[in-house]
Amino acid sequence: MKALTARQQEVFDLIRDHISQTGMPPTRAEIAQRLGFRSPNAAEEHLKALARKGVIEIVSGASRGIRLLQEEEEGLPLVGRVAAGEPLLAQQHIEGHYQVDPSLFKPNADFLLRVSGMSMKDIGIMDGDLLAVHKTQDVRNGQVVVARIDDEVTVKRLKKQGNKVELLPENSEFKPIVVDLRQQSFTIEGLAVGVIRNGDWL
């Protein structure tokens, strides 16, 4: 892959962040508006440059016809420390990519999350491990999830009842996190589907 200019990197980051937040790429008009271009045509020129450099594919005839190629080549993105209020898969959180077959996990893994702390050690999730995560909000009680409470991201076992959510640790030294859905912001970022021990698998 050829190196990107600062402006091209900005466009690429916007596309990736938009996909992670909404599930679809932005239109040319949205790119122009977000980055202060005078017209969608200016955004189109940057997209053509990104396509020439092999990081995106432009699908003709569709206003959102942009496909990222980089992740497919590089493997699963590894998410490190997440800044408050930002999308989990925002470009600045991605430490690198691992060549891991997503289909080794059931359901397929969409990204890896670096585990911080020992609150889940009793089920073999240790500090520094890479947690394979399937991006979904369709989860059930008893499953281990990646959750965001207000602006904090955590890995815990889910127990939801009415307007109350308990996020249960798997370590007796830690207390459950209790969330009142009427007062706190709560989002499921994904379902834990496997563990890679301390980055041994590259």
Swiss-Prot record:
Disulphide linkage map: none
Keyword Cell inner membrane annotated: no
Gene disruption: observed consequences: Cells are filamented, accumulate DNA double-strand breaks, have viability defects at 10 ng/ml ciprofoxacin. Synthetically lethal in combination with a priB deletion.
Keyword annotations from UniProtKB, A to Z: Autocatalytic cleavage, DNA damage, DNA repair, DNA replication, DNA-binding, Hydrolase, Repressor, SOS response, Transcription, Transcription regulation
A GO BP entry: DNA replication
UniProt entry tagged with the keyword Zinc-finger: no
Marked site (Cleavage) residue numbers: 84-85
Membrane-spanning intervals of the chain: none
Gene Ontology molecular functions: DNA binding; DNA-binding transcription repressor activity; identical protein binding; sequence-specific DNA binding; serine-type endopeptidase activity; transcription cis-regulatory region binding
Record-annotated DNA-binding residue ranges: 28-48
EC number(s) stated in the UniProt entry for this protein: 3.4.21.88
InterPro entries, sorted: LexA, LexA-like, LexA/Signal_pep-like_sf, LexA_DNA-bd_dom, LexA_repressor, Peptidase_S24_LexA, Peptidase_S24_S26A/B/C, WH-like_DNA-bd_sf
Gene3D superfamilies documented for this protein: Umud Fragment, subunit A (2.10.109.10), Winged helix-like DNA-binding domain superfamily/Winged helix DNA-binding domain (1.10.10.10)
GO cellular component: cytosol; protein-DNA complex
Active site positions, chain numbering: 119 (for autocatalytic cleavage activity), 156 (for autocatalytic cleavage activity)
Reactions listed under catalytic activity: Hydrolysis of Ala-|-Gly bond in repressor LexA
Homology family: Belongs to the peptidase S24 family.
Subunit structure of this chain's protein: Homodimer.
Annotated function: Represses a number of genes involved in the response to DNA damage (SOS response), including recA and lexA. Binds to the 16 bp palindromic sequence 5'-CTGTATATATATACAG-3'. In the presence of single-stranded DNA, RecA interacts with LexA causing an autocatalytic cleavage which disrupts the DNA-binding part of LexA, leading to derepression of the SOS regulon and eventually DNA repair. Implicated in hydroxy radical-mediated cell death induced by hydroxyurea treatment.
NCBIfam families, sorted: lexA
Name assigned to this protein: LexA repressor
Classification lineage: Bacteria, Pseudomonadati, Pseudomonadota, Gammaproteobacteria, Enterobacterales
Gene, per the UniProt record: lexA
